[in-house]
Amino acid sequence: MTLEKELILRLNVGHNTVIRDVQLWREFEDGDGQIAVKNCLAEVVGMVNIDKLPFWLNRGQRYQCFTTSETSVNYFRAKLMRQRHRNRGIVCKVTGSQVLTKEQFEYFLFYKRLKTDINASFEIESMVLHLSTKHELDKKLIPLSADELQSVVPSNAGATMSIESILEKNKRQRILKSNSLNKQVLLNDQQQQFMSLLSQCILSGLRLRGVHRTQHEKLYKMTYKASEFAFRDELRETEPISFESIQDCVETLLKLFTKT
């Protein structure tokens, strides 16, 4: 048996971040010949507790994970190698490949494993998850009779969600969280731009009116606070506030405050 590289992943980990050169190696028979290395895209869809995974997942192919990318090393170190993450697994879905089919690779599970060497160090492994295996097992289940169903008391009611539902829920949560973060970033950017334009308009208006230094600071603060209040609704939206609107507001306030 020889350890050969079979796959190279580009992994979308969320928030427009993609880590590269995630190499998956596994053992092949010596007579298997040259192994063609395949490239594919994948995305993280959720985190799971590997101690609570169903037994049928252990039937998948197993890989050792390597990389030459410092960014990829840091990602897996932060997500899997810390003590508080000792039972964590990362579920990834294959999203694009020119050579792989859904039957070959659908999901990957990344987790850490204690190496069986003298150093007793950890390494990252990956396992292929085939939901088709679960579907086949589901078909072979013997249905219970009505009497048997009544006598069965579920020990963990509500916890029988399929792995497909869990993964889909995790994906929706990630999308909602990402959208919320993106909106907050846009709001912060708009507020910074508004503050800068507002300050420029007020200072320019005060200079044009030749306001005395003793009144300068007081008028600036009054105009600034009044303008913020006037645009309070617009500042809750991601649509930028135009320079002309800010300038008109400042001019109106300065005319009122200076009676010019």
From Swiss-Prot:
Q: Which GO terms describe its biological process?
A: DNA replication; regulation of DNA-templated DNA replication initiation
Key words, A-Z: Cell cycle, Cytoplasm, Cytoskeleton, DNA replication, Nucleus
Where does it reside?
Nucleus; Cytoplasm, Cytoskeleton, Spindle pole
Gene Ontology, cellular component aspect: cytoplasm; nucleus; spindle pole
Source superkingdom: Eukaryota
Q: Show the stretches that span the lipid bilayer.
A: none
Primary location group: nucleus
**UniProt cross-references to InterPro entries, sorted A to Z:** Sld7 (IPR016808), Sld7_C (IPR041260), Sld7_N (IPR041564)
Function description: Required for the proper initiation of DNA replication. Required for mitochondrial morphology.
Family, per entry: Belongs to the SLD7 family.
Name of this chain's protein: Mitochondrial morphogenesis protein SLD7
